[in-house]
């Protein structure tokens, strides 16, 4: 093996990289690499694991070409050897020793844990048509973890209650199933956790910890996109827990089919139940406003609550922001709440009740999102039951929400005006008796106007 002084080419590369990445990244990913052999034809490197090798090539391949020998294809002539971590033979550990090992790694891993928010519980989650289904699913899996809907995949826009439900599941299980091991973590924290254990050469300890869980709660899985190496480890953990009938709950801003992840992990996420959290309707927004106001000791009359909810309709966080602003104004200036006060204090948050012009394309995108179908399929000619229904709802909403003629609407869908008319009559007839369809149509409307 060459000494460090002999590794001049590699040292030059290291000095170059140090100036182009953070100290943490260098220590985590570059510093652990050791030179085993260096010749004019190639360099042999020892890496602690395959993640480090892939990181080096994914991020510094072009730079490596300027320093290290190249092969006949113009690629860096590097040979990688993954270090072997030999363990002395030992008798099989007892259950007590095994638990102690898991407890030890828990102490290392808990720094990455997302603490459950004490305010996020089922009993203070305001229910409405846009979230009724997903809340019922969350309550169901919290009551019987691992029995059904596994994994539960919750998706929806920012500030609509995904994290609230995730933490509510954690609280319920912790209180009603005290013997179960629970871990709540953001995707970014999972990645940082893995980096930490890669650096300390203790990935096996991390694997043992995660695979000893009874309930894994993962927030914002969309941040796993474009992180292929970490995605593989997450997928392995995911599969192990599912195969052991351990419950997993995941949140995301998109349904699995729209995430830029491998087909393998997308298929796994769709194994259980995929549930959408929609934009709350007016009545639900009013209920949320009044609940948040009550928590702050602020009394909002119904008329005023409806007025605010009619002008703030993006998400729950905006409603919370409005309450915080009104509470601060009343306390700081010692004034009571009036319509003028509301209008002046919240004017920067208000949006006009007459939303921006709605187009057929807007309607198609919203319906595709709500029904979790591809936009091209919705515009196409597929006669599958789900697509036909979604397409008819889109036509019905186009006729209801925009002023274009049936001919123009039909042209936008690539259909005749008679097809649009038939679709509208079909949906209107079904709406008279089908409560599920009513909820679906309202969900689409909320998504469009929100």
UniProtKB/Swiss-Prot annotation:
GO terms for cellular component: cytoplasm; plasma membrane. The keyword Methyltransferase does not apply. Residues 1-87 are annotated as: Domain I, interacts with DnaA modulators. ATP binds at residues 159, 161-163. Residues 87-114 are annotated as: Domain II. Transmembrane segments: none annotated. GO terms for biological process: DNA replication initiation; regulation of DNA replication. It is found in: Cytoplasm. Residues 331-450 are annotated as: Domain IV, binds dsDNA. Coiled coil: none annotated. Keywords: ATP-binding, Cytoplasm, DNA replication, DNA-binding, Lipid-binding, Nucleotide-binding. Residues 115-330 are annotated as: Domain III, AAA+ region. One of its GO terms (molecular function) is ATP hydrolysis activity. SMART domains: AAA, Bac_DnaA_C. Signal peptide: none annotated. Domain I is involved in oligomerization and binding regulators, domain II is flexibile and of varying length in different bacteria, domain III forms the AAA+ region, while domain IV binds dsDNA. PANTHER family: CHROMOSOMAL REPLICATION INITIATOR PROTEIN DNAA. Belongs to the DnaA family. Oligomerizes as a right-handed, spiral filament on DNA at oriC. Plays an essential role in the initiation and regulation of chromosomal replication. ATP-DnaA binds to the origin of replication (oriC) to initiate formation of the DNA replication initiation complex once per cell cycle. Binds the DnaA box (a 9 base pair repeat at the origin) and separates the double-stranded (ds)DNA. Forms a right-handed helical filament on oriC DNA; dsDNA binds to the exterior of the filament while single-stranded (ss)DNA is stabiized in the filament's interior. This is Chromosomal replication initiator protein DnaA 2. It comes from Chlamydia pneumoniae.
């Amino acid at each position: 093996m060459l000494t460090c002084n002999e590794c001049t080419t590699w040292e030059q590369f290291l000095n170059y990289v140090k100036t182009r990445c953070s100290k943490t990244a260098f220590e985590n990913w570059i510093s652990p690499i050791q030179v085993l052999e260096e010749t004019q034809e190639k360099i042999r490197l020892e890496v602690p694991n395959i993640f480090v090798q892939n990181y080096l090539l994914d991020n510094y391949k072009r730079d490596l070409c300027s320093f290290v020998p190249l092969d006949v294809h113009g690629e860096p002539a590097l040979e990688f050897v993954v270090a072997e971590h030999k363990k002395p033979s030992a008798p099989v550990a007892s259950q007590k020793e095994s638990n102690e090992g898991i407890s030890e790694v828990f102490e290392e891993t808990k720094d990455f844990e997302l603490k459950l928010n004490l305010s996020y519980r089922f009993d203070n989650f305001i229910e409405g048509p846009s979230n009724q289904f997903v809340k019922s699913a969350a309550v169901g899996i919290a009551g019987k973890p691992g029995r059904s809907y596994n994994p539960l995949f919750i998706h929806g826009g920012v500030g609509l209650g995904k994290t609230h439900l995730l933490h509510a599941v954690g609280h319920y299980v912790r209180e009603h199933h005290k013997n179960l091991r629970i871990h709540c973590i953001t995707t970014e924290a999972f990645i940082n956790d893995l980096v930490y254990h890669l650096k300390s050469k203790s990935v096996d300890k991390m694997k043992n910890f995660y695979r000893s869980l009874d309930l894994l709660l993962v927030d914002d899985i969309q941040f796993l996109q474009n992180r292929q190496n970490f995605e593989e480890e997450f997928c392995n953990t995911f599969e192990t827990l599912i195969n052991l009938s351990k419950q997993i709950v995941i949140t995301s801003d998109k349904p699995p089919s729209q995430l830029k992840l491998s087909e393998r992990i997308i298929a796994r996420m769709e194994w259980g139940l995929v549930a959408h959290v929609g934009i709350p309707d007016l009545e639900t927004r009013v209920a949320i406003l009044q609940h948040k106001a009550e928590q702050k000791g602020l009394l909002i009359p119904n008329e005023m609550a409806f007025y605010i909810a009619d002008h703030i309709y993006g998400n729950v966080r905006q409603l919370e922001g409005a309450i915080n602003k009104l509470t601060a104004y009343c306390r700081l200036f010692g004034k009571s709440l009036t319509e003028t006060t509301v209008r002046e204090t919240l004017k920067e948050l208000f949006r006009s009740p007459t939303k921006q012009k709605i187009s057929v394309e807007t309607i198609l995108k919203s319906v595709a999102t709500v029904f979790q179908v591809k936009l091209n399929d919705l515009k196409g000619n597929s006669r599958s039951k789900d697509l036909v229904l979604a397409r008819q709802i889109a036509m019905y909403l186009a006729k209801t929400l925009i002023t274009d003629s049936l001919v123009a609407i039909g042209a936008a869908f690539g259909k005749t005006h008679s097809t649009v008319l038939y679709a509208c009559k079909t949906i209107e007839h079904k709406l008279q008796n089908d409560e599920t369809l009513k909820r679906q149509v309202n969900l689409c409307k909320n998504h469009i106007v929100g």
